[in-house]
């Protein structure tokens, strides 16, 4: 018996990376999964590999009409909806003064507007199905910012806030809404040049000194979508290896990288 036997789940951005891992995990635990993306060739291949319990739909998450079509396809496929994972996202690093309005809005439309439209259009079918769960993928950059990520950070902070508003409004319908805040993840977005050095080097000052992997984020998402999290809503689940917890200082005791310095010896 799987946690999602008889359940129907939509995952956006499911053609590869983190979204693919989420879709595969839901399917492995018994769910019918609708994989939504704009990468049609990749998405269709993943759905075919999962098998009869998966269906691929083309979805530009910034397009309301395409969302409505995706929800209709989901109802046709599974007859209901139990969970939505708003995973689709893009990133466009640039300094504020070098960011055009067009580039800024491109990220906002996918990340923030896409999440809004997903919640809005999925809610009636979730309600009709007796309630369910929405998991919105934010980021550690929706809690603490970085330079060069003005549009991405704005969108991820917005997702954090929208999640709480939706949780407040829809709890009466049995719909829980939570956000997941990954740190670095070994995907095309998190490690775009697929360099093994980037799996460890940037993370030497966090508690778990490596990049995260898609299956680790998927596990957190599945938990929040499941009955195991039945009394959890409006919350933020940080999955970042301790990035936001603090920084290991090599000049102080308690680090494997401790060196002579600050009056301390290794």
Residue ranges and their predicted role:
Residues 179, 200-232, 239-241, 266:
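C-terminal helical subdomain
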Residues 95-96, 103-105, 202:
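Substrate-binding pocket helix/loop in short-chain dehydrogenase/reductase
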Residues 124, 168-169, 230:
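Alpha-helical segment proximal to the catalytic Tyr-Lys
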Residues 85, 171, 176, 232-234:
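Short, small/polar-rich loop/turn modules that mediate ligand/substrate recognition or access, typified
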Residues 119, 155, 163:
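Active-site helix of classical SDR
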Residues 139:
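Residue(s) in the substrate-gating loop at a strand-loop-helix junction
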Residues 2-34, 166:
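Canonical Rossmann dinucleotide-binding motif of NAD(H)/NADP(H)-dependent dehydrogenases/reductases
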